[in-house]
């Protein structure tokens, strides 16, 4: 799972440039964070996107909007993203996620970055597993107001920074 920043940035840029959605107004941002992790933001002005979709990561279920680890075996296959409700925006969003997954696998397979990694006997960058879709911050009260104190958070990972932002805590990098 070790991916150099240069490779992560290069693959992200390549995906952003080469992925073409069936909805021509749809754009994608692939932002490398730490190690092998990225955030993927799909945006389109043509329709509101939904967080009510399944994960493509076979090791995690989406239960009540939360990612929950599954008991899994050795071989895992990327799952197709499905709508969790019979609404047009959920179906539309699931379709965009599936288009992203299918195209990104092909793009990474043919990438010059992967050819270079192969020459260096490094593992190939093969897919991006998506989980825990969201289209808005959760509506939670500020922890500072709730407890009438001033809280802060020492953060090291993007998820910790996100939690501190949602709860309106001041964040300090570790």
Language-model regions: role of each:
Residues 1-174:
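Feature captures the catalytic ectodomains and active-site-proximal regions of enzymes
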């Amino acid at each position: 799972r070790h991916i150099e920043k240069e490779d992560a940035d290069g693959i992200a840029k390549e995906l952003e440039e080469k992925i073409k959605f069936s909805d021509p107004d749809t754009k994608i941002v692939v932002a490398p964070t730490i190690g092998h992790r990225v955030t993927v933001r799909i945006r389109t002005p043509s329709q509101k996107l939904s967080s009510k979709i399944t994960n493509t990561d076979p090791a995690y279920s989406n239960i009540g909007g939360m990612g929950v680890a599954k008991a899994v075996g050795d071989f895992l296959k990327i799952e197709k993203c499905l709508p969790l409700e019979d609404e047009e925006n959920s179906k539309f969003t699931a379709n965009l996620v599936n288009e992203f997954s299918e195209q990104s696998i092909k793009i990474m397979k043919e990438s010059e970055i992967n050819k270079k990694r192969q020459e260096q006997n490094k593992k190939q960058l093969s897919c991006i597993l998506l989980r825990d879709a969201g289209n808005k911050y959760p509506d939670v009260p500020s922890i500072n107001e709730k407890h009438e104190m001033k809280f802060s958070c020492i953060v090291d990972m993007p998820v910790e920074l996100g939690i501190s932002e949602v709860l309106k805590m001041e964040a300090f990098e570790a």
